[in-house]
Amino acid sequence: MARTQAEPPASQPDARAAWLRDQLERANYAYYVLDQPDLPDAEYDRLFGELQQLETDHPDLVTPDSPTQRVGGEVAGGFTPVVHDAPMLSLNNGFADEDIAAFDKRVADALGKTTDLAGSVTDPVEYACELKFDGLAISLRYEHGVFVQASTRGDGTTGEDVTENVRTIRSIPLKLKGAHVPALLDVRGEVLMFKRDFARLNERQRAAEQREFANPRNAAAGSLRQLDPKITAQRPLSFFAYGIGVLDGMPMPDTHSALLDWYESFGLPVNRERAVVYGADGLLGFFRKVGEKRESLPYDIDGVVYKVNRRDEQDRLGFVSRAPRFALAHKFPAQEALTRLVAIDVQVGRTGAITPVARLEPVFVGGATVTNATLHNEDEVRRKDIRIGDTVIVRRAGDVIPEVVGALLDRRPDDAAEFVMPTECPVCGSKIERLPDEAIARCTGGLFCPAQRKQALWHFAQRRALDIDGLGEKIIDQLVELNLVRTPADLFNLGFATLAELDRFAEKSAQNLLDSLEKAKHTTLARFIYGLGIRHVGESTAKDLAKHFGSLTPIMDASIEELLEVNDVGPIVAESIHQFFAEEHNRTVIEQLRAPGKVTWAEGPPAPRAPQGVLAGKTVVLTGTLPNLTRDAAKEMLEAAGAKVAGSVSKKTDYVVAGADAGSKLAKAEELGIPVLDEDGLHQLLEGNTP
């Protein structure tokens, strides 16, 4: 949404008010009609508050179409307009503790509450406290207990008829429970989407290669306002009732809390996170309690709502033009804010992932000052069209890493610069590469890069790699932080005195680790390849590489075409292997590991062409305990005969070899009609005889 009008200074109140009205109306249209909000809530509130203050200071600036004189947005095309029997008003906002104290004082004074000599209220106001949901407000109309119509808030006076869409929301009863129901009931509440449902919806959107929703609020609004109710029916929407418009045929409950209990008796969904409290202290206590559990709630909220509980006191307090005097929304610190992006750097993760990071002018958001925010990856920067120098929307929720949501294109300076992914790692100078079909670019210096050092050492020491017993994460942390080990090759230079000085590392532990390192010097080529931590190269692929090439040097020098000849190595894996060995830093570390007195293994000639016997190319599954063969021995014999040993039974399985205590794999094989062999049958196959 373009905002091209120049921003006038505060010294020109007429022009400033006109500019503020324009900004707010454009934001309202994007939010309520397009369902594509482009202005953070905090920025909207700031502009709205400034306009309110201007109009208070200069009453002649108030216009009938000012956003301060209305509630919501225009009615969009495509839906039938609905005039509300009672206006759907919004709420005034409070942010600081002082705002809440001032609200309580205004209410207490208006109700004539008694005070002591110190000015403290001796008869505090009773309030009902609820959550402020981040969804879409709607009105539900029931006639004689039967649901007949649903409408959106719209501009507060006229909304949109979304009856057929709301019928698809399963938590909304189409008929109220109980024998005694009002002749007419206008229920006010919020349509929202739970966090888990939002995550599942976006998973489906990704699978269908459709646009993902930015947040649960956008998803709920977009789903409710679909022209096709069948689409709405596929969206996991929920509803909570929290207010009332009109009531006919039954007396109104005496308190707001009683109204919500009454709703529950009718089968309407009402949120249980609510309380009745007294005075400003009670309000602030509820706010803090909710704030502590906010992130663990299954839905998004952006604050809490306070309402004078007694209905007769609500009536005495009445309304102002756009909001009730008896209620206030106490909003949490903004989770989104505007600031300027001054630079884009890249960070290197422990697995080599290169992440663009926005360097920001400091901004207070989500309860903390933020100067850095993630941009996720190069594609995200391009998709969001974020450039250096832009005014950007920054989001921070709870403990989540701050992120840049988008840029305000109308505020883009002429010299805004596009982000260019560097070609070399900023930490170690190795090449940065990006595999086909992957969103993440990576540093290829896995064995050398300091940013990947701990991960490389941990992987190298794994049981299925060099099997260095006693080299756990805490020991690795100390070795790296004390600069005693930079690459896996340095492990074999460690001495007893150095290890014995490590924190909480006794002499016996030091000797055990040295013994384990000595043992690790004698390994296999497959274990060594796996221990290098090449992306996409697991234990099975490492074995295939070792078997195919016979020695390490041919693997290091192999072309992508030669790598593709290896069993189960596809284009992505071949590219990853080739990139790893093409990086000179990695080759240097490997040569250090192969130096005299370091790591050795038995090498042999390249594997002959694949066997042509009855097992060549067959898939075999082992299950249970064989009388004379261990599972590893059986696996080696099968692989030597050209078979592939799989871990699970499927329609592609050719044989299942079952021993004692065979379980679900045997049952699955029998169900699929796959031949089942015992140990004798296995030997017959290995000898070339079909069973």
UniProtKB/Swiss-Prot annotation:
Binding site residues for Zn(2+): 425, 428, 443, 449
Pfam family, one: HHH_2
SMART domains referenced in this protein's UniProt entry, alphabetically: BRCT, HhH1, LIGANc
Reaction equation(s) it catalyzes: NAD(+) + (deoxyribonucleotide)n-3'-hydroxyl + 5'-phospho-(deoxyribonucleotide)m = (deoxyribonucleotide)n+m + AMP + beta-nicotinamide D-nucleotide
Any Gene Ontology biological process: DNA repair
InterPro entries: BRCT_dom, BRCT_dom_sf, DisA/LigA_HHH, DNA_ligase, DNA_ligase_AS, DNA_ligase_CS, DNAligase_adenylation, DNAligase_N
Keyword Acetylation: no
Gene Ontology CC terms, in alphabetical order: cytosol
Keywords: DNA damage, DNA repair, DNA replication, Ligase, Magnesium, Manganese, Metal-binding, NAD, Zinc
Molecular function terms from GO: DNA binding; DNA ligase (NAD+) activity; metal ion binding
Cofactor(s) demanded: Mg(2+); Mn(2+)
Task performed by this protein: DNA ligase that catalyzes the formation of phosphodiester linkages between 5'-phosphoryl and 3'-hydroxyl groups in double-stranded DNA using NAD as a coenzyme and as the energy source for the reaction. It is essential for DNA replication and repair of damaged DNA.
Name by which UniProt lists this protein: DNA ligase
Native organism: Burkholderia ambifaria (strain ATCC BAA-244 / DSM 16087 / CCUG 44356 / LMG 19182 / AMMD) (Burkholderia cepacia (strain AMMD))
Lineage: Bacteria, Pseudomonadati, Pseudomonadota, Betaproteobacteria, Burkholderiales
